[in-house]
Amino acid sequence: MLPPDPLHPLRPFLKNFVWEHGHIGTRYINCVTGEISFDDGKKSRFAAEKYLYVPLDKDATDDPLVTGPATQDAALARFLRAAQLGKPEEAGSAAEVQRAVHDCLDLAIFSAYQHDALQAVDHYTQEAMFDDEIRAALVDDIRRVYTPMREQLALYDFTVLHGLPTPLLFSDSPFIDWRVRVKPAMPFVSLPLGPYALLIGTPSGRTSRAAPVAWKTAVSMGVLKDHNRLMAERARLWIVATSDDQLIAIQDRFKKDDA
């Protein structure tokens, strides 16, 4: 009996982008080739890249055999579905929603540091270092940057914006830090939960645990109008969308010259 397919860390989010009317599957663009494709079924087979996991807790023991952050999958799936449907009453209790948002952030940061992790491995493998030394150096590099970020975000206030008028793109690097990605800087971070739902984090000013998650219906994109552009700019491997038109609009960014 074959072992089950390994689950991509972002698979819980990708489920909200599966087209389930008639031909079931996901529309995506390959950022390496610029090819637009339709992935049949619900497995998101195009999202097959390997992840390097680094535990970000300061005192956490690094175990290379651990493949990702611990998440409560059932509660996370319920929260993501409720966000996409715009039904907070179906998201679970306040505590369950807070835990789901915590899991979302851990997965978002997990995806955010993959490029840095791969670059670090490429760099250290060219040095005269043993495998365990390479791993230790990688862990130090990632923790130096992303542990403070994770601690800061743990104190943010979070809002689920649902019913967005424009469908969102979702990529292999879906977390957007608007504090550094746009000028002038905007004081929030975001993560798509589905085509029409977005998790927004803003500074709370508190030094203890953040407040309960808020839910708001979006009446316009407002300052989020650049979301899809920023998503396309940071993508390295793939981008999913709800329509081919969305992907065609960004295809020139990824098309390779024939010459």
Question: Each predicted region: which residue ranges?
Answer:
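Alpha-helical structural context detector biased toward long hydrophobic helices
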Residues: M1-A259
